[in-house]
Amino acid sequence: MNYKIPVSVLVLVHTADLQVLLLERADRPGFWQSVTGSQDAGETLLQTAQRELAEETGIVAEASILTDWQRQNRYEIYAHWRNRYAPGVTHNTEHVFSLKLPAVQDIVLAPREHLDCQWLPWREAADCVFSWSNAEVIRELPLRMSQRT
């Protein structure tokens, strides 16, 4: 059996004026999140971020425009998803990236993964996501942006 690697990425897609892209999960309607996904064997984290971004949004981004936050979140894998991982694996390590776009743009959803998308001001987006790690990253966005200017 091919088990999932317990390493993933979260890619925060946003605009310069701090509009944040959220995707509604197909397997859990009403649950909103940023781009996320597990690392495939042989991929670097940056390659994982690029692949997930393209698969989930249709955005093809050069590696040079993705920002690696050098931040990791470790969290427990939900019990009902543990069968996807090797026996004994209980935690996942999530690596954070972001992509700043000049403006809101149309998104091409992966219909098996997401039902809908929306662009929200960062505060609303942070309140809308179901994952604590996603909310923390969104809340850090204004500070991160101010440090880059």
Predicted regions and their residues:
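A short gly/proline-enriched turn/hairpin at secondary-structure junctions
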Residues: 33-36
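Unchanged
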Residues: 39-132
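A conserved beta-turn-beta hairpin within the catalytic core of GNAT-like acetyltransferases
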Residues: 28-31
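Charged phosphate-binding loop/patch that engages nucleotide di/tri-phosphates or the phosphate backbone
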Residues: 126-149
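Low-complexity, intrinsically disordered short peptide segments enriched in small/polar/basic residues
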Residues: 2, 6, 17, 74, ...
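Short, acidic/hydrophobic/Gly-rich beta-strand patch recurrent on exposed beta strands
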Residues: 22-25
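Conserved N-terminal beta-strand and adjoining loop/helix that marks the start
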Residues: 1-20, 41
